[in-house]
């Protein structure tokens, strides 16, 4: 029944809305969930495109929440505020350059060679350990950048290079950029907010590229597939509206250690599942 497929889209949208912003890997969670819950009669080309384009719902939540801050044409902004807005966008562009120069050419290669349980599990664990170790270090080190307006262009570029590491499935785009920011002396609040903004060009760009590749390979969406995708995007948007606000408040009082522990636990479970699956497949 198509109604069941709609329910699956709702589930995928909820997972995307939560895991896109928490540094726990949306791709890793979608790979895991789709091992047990998957659409009927949908080919690999559609699912590859779906898992990326669903992110548009999540990123639109950032645009909605921060529209005033991101809009340089807001009538009541002073010239100084307009200048600050353009400077913010300039930093986002600078931070996006590594993804354009390195990420786009290597995307297919990473997709082909690392989009599997073992790779996802390993990256979940590695970054989980990284979060714990970095936060232990940061207990004795004060951040040097505590205001987004003061974020240096050099630091923005540094964070952008870390974003490229999220090409490894299981890394988490937000996880990679947050780790990069924390290592470079950026406060949790600043790097979290900058991560939200950095996702705008990257996720729109990634979605556009996936759709273009999908079409160029001779594929097309039927009404059912379009419905499944739109439902997932709408749900991801709604859930992201809450999760973004939650994480923004959370990092003001807490560190990322709990996410590190969660990543290690999930990565271990994925490895155990992979081992048992391999054993029983023989």
Swiss-Prot record:
Provide a GO biological process annotation.
response to antibiotic
Q: Which GO terms describe its molecular function?
A: undecaprenyl-diphosphatase activity
The UniProt entry lists membrane topology as: Multi-pass membrane protein
Class of enzymatic activity (EC top level): hydrolase
Reaction equation(s) it catalyzes = di-trans,octa-cis-undecaprenyl diphosphate + H2O = di-trans,octa-cis-undecaprenyl phosphate + phosphate + H(+)
- Show the InterPro entries listed in the entry: UppP
Task: Quote the EC number.
Answer: 3.6.1.27
What are the entry keywords? Antibiotic resistance, Cell membrane, Cell shape, Cell wall biogenesis/degradation, Hydrolase, Membrane, Peptidoglycan synthesis, Transmembrane, Transmembrane helix
Q: Which parts of the chain span the membrane according to its record?
A: 45-65, 86-106, 114-134, 151-171, 196-216, 224-244, 256-276
Decide whether keyword Nucleus is in the record. Answer: no
Q: Where does this polypeptide localize? A: Cell membrane
What Pfam families is this protein classified in? BacA (PF02673)
- What do the Gene Ontology cellular component annotations say? plasma membrane
Keyword Kinase in annotation: no
Supply any other comment: Bacitracin is thought to be involved in the inhibition of peptidoglycan synthesis by sequestering undecaprenyl diphosphate, thereby reducing the pool of lipid carrier available.
Summarizing the function annotation, the protein's role is: Catalyzes the dephosphorylation of undecaprenyl diphosphate (UPP). Confers resistance to bacitracin.
Family of this protein: Belongs to the UppP family.
Q: What is this protein called?
A: Undecaprenyl-diphosphatase
Which organism does this sequence originate in? Streptococcus gordonii (strain Challis / ATCC 35105 / BCRC 15272 / CH1 / DL1 / V288)
The record's gene field reads uppP
């Amino acid at each position: 029944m198509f109604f069941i497929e709609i329910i699956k889209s709702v589930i995928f949208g909820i997972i995307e809305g939560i895991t896109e912003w928490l540094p726990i890997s949306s791709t890793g969670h979608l790979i895991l969930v789709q091992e047990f819950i998957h659409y009927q009669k949908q080919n690999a080309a559609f699912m590859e495109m779906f898992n990326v384009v669903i992110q548009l719902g999540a990123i639109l939540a950032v645009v909605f929440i921060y529209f005033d801050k991101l809009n340089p044409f807001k009538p009541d902004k002073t010239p100084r505020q307009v200048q600050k807005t353009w400077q913010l966008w300039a930093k986002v562009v600078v931070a996006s350059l590594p993804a354009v120069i390195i990420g786009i050419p290597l995307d297919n290669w990473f997709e082909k060679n690392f989009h599997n349980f073992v790779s996802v599990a390993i990256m979940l664990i590695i970054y989980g350990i990284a979060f714990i170790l970095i936060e232990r270090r940061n207990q004795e080190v004060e951040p040097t950048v505590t205001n987004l307006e003061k974020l240096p262009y050099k630091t923005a570029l540094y964070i952008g290079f870390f974003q490229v590491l999220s090409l490894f499935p299981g890394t988490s785009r937000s996880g990679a950029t947050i780790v990069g920011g924390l290592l470079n002396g950026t406060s949790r609040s600043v790097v979290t907010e900058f991560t939200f903004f950095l996702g705008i060009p990257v996720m729109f760009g990634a979605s556009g590229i996936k759709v273009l590749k999908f079409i160029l390979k001779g594929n097309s969406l039927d009404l059912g597939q379009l419905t499944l995708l739109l439902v997932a995007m709408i749900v991801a948007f709604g859930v992201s509206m809450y999760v973004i606000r939650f994480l923004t408040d959370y990092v003001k009082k807490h560190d990322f250690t709990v996410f590190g522990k969660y990543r290690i636990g999930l990565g271990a479970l994925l490895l155990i599942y992979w081992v048992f699956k391999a054993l029983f497949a023989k």
